[in-house]
Amino acid sequence: MNYPAVAKELLTLLGGKSNITALAHCATRLRLAVADEQKIDEQAIDNLEGVKGQFKVAGQYQIIFGSGIVNQVYAEMAKLTGMSEMSTNDVASAGAEKQNIVQPAVKGLSDIFVPIIPAIVAGGLLMGIYNLLTAQGLFIDGKSLIEANPGLTDLANMINTFANAPFVYLPILLAFSASKKFGGNPYLGAALGMLMVHPDLLNGWGFGGASVSGNIPVWNILGFEIQKVGYQGSVLPVLVSAFILAKVELGLRKVIPSVLDNLLTPLLAIFIAGLLTFTVVGPFTRDIGFLLGDGLNWLYNTAGFVGGAVFGLIYAPFVITGMHHSFIAIETQLLADIATTGGTFIFPIAAMSNVSQGAAALAVGVMSKDKKMKGIAIPSGVTGLLGITEPAMFGVNLKLRYPFIAAVCAAALSSAFITMFNVKAQALGAAGLPGIISITPDKIGYYIAGMVIAFLTAFVLTIVLGIGDRAKVGKKAAA
């Protein structure tokens, strides 16, 4: 290979020397930050000798040459640009400056969730198995598998316990990972997560019913009442609290003498962060969720299929924050007055969103040539179809962005469809394929049609959006 010639041509295809703001390389890739991405001729670069792929990530433009070759190309590029003293960190910093506010936020969420994906995937698959065992009428008319085979009852109960564990104690996993990401001690983060799911607190999933009945337990401290409510399965309160904990910890370490650091810093950090969690962060984020839920209730009842489309479009972003748990209170009220309401409209729309996210992840798994990404995408997609979308969203769809876009568009379309036919659920369950048994009998056909629309739209749209960027699908997981 004529390295000087390749480097010279590559520089031209990148828009010239003036378009390169940072240059470095790793073991296999040339890493750059550019002033204007529109000046890059990606198609011509794909056909350049030695190039094995290219993709954009975190504001950086990366070209894959392979081990050995990249060093030679970089050396020639450095001569042409005069950028021979830069590191990959310099390129990352330059690339970060080009990112909008959404990109680093999405990357940060991905960095936090990716390490805990195996636990969530395991729980999701086990929950799907439990739903199949306990779903009435799914395999046997009028009965579930465990009703037909009582000897399987305890097995189903055991599987349910295994399945719930990662979600009940999600704040522990999440706080550990988030604290590490925010620069704090991850074990202090885990302690904060344990505090948020302590058994002395009202179970977070029981808050909706307790708020309706007015039986929310409180701590009464000098006349000031603090709700004793847990945050099982929550995301946003945990992320905010972990961020506060990390910053408090780092701040304390700067002012507390080293001789007292190991004693006072953990004590004060946990106390301050815990107090703020139960007095400000938790109630505030939960109230936001209730306000949004009330707004969606109004939207559905007044805007018809348009309201259904909007709800379907934004349901997945609610899942990202954990605010979708606030809908349980609304659904409880809707089901309590089922003679008047006809059931809950939230469950079917949630199912459309979940199926869409699962289908998008499966499409990535089909497209991907990278074994690691395929190994994450396919099982995550399956759990999404069964009603558990966190693995698909955080491990695949948000990380690549365009599968998430495809999924929310599919959710909007399918939600509009089922809203036109007033599809509602008469019970709660797994919001996905097993959710068929929860739908009012005369609307099951429309529910199935909606899931088909959701799946096909998300799957096809993901492939269409990803065709021009296959390198991202196959290589971004390793970036």
Curated annotation (Swiss-Prot):
Q: Which Pfam families does the entry mention?
A: PTS_EIIB, PTS_EIIC
Which residue pairs form cystines in this protein? Answer: none
Does Amino-acid biosynthesis appear among the keywords? no
Residues of the active site are 26
Single GO MF descriptor:
kinase activity
What stretches pass through the bilayer? 112-132, 158-178, 182-202, 204-224, 232-252, 264-284, 303-323, 345-365, 376-396, 403-423, 448-468
Q: Which residues form the PTS EIIB type-1 domain?
A: 4-87
Q: How does it sit in the membrane?
A: Multi-pass membrane protein
Main subcellular localisation: membrane
Q: Give the location in the cell.
A: Cell inner membrane
Cellular component terms, GO, for this chain's entry?
plasma membrane
Catalytic activity, reaction form: N(pros)-phospho-L-histidyl-[protein](out) + sucrose = sucrose 6(G)-phosphate(in) + L-histidyl-[protein]
Q: Which key words are in the record?
A: Cell inner membrane, Cell membrane, Kinase, Membrane, Phosphotransferase system, Sugar transport, Transferase, Transmembrane, Transmembrane helix, Transport
EC number(s): the record gives 2.7.1.211
Which segments constitute the PTS EIIC type-1 domain? Answer: 120-477
What is one Gene Ontology biological process annotated in the Swiss-Prot or TrEMBL record?
trehalose transport
How does the record comment on the protein's domains? The PTS EIIB type-1 domain is phosphorylated by phospho-EIIA on a cysteinyl residue. Then, it transfers the phosphoryl group to the sugar substrate concomitantly with the sugar uptake processed by the PTS EIIC type-1 domain. The EIIC domain type-1 forms the PTS system translocation channel and contains the specific substrate-binding site.
User: What exactly does this protein do?
Assistant: The phosphoenolpyruvate-dependent sugar phosphotransferase system (sugar PTS), a major carbohydrate active transport system, catalyzes the phosphorylation of incoming sugar substrates concomitantly with their translocation across the cell membrane. This system is involved in sucrose transport.
User: What's the protein called, per UniProt?
Assistant: PTS system sucrose-specific EIIBC component
Give the organism, scientific name: Vibrio alginolyticus
Gene name in the database record? scrA
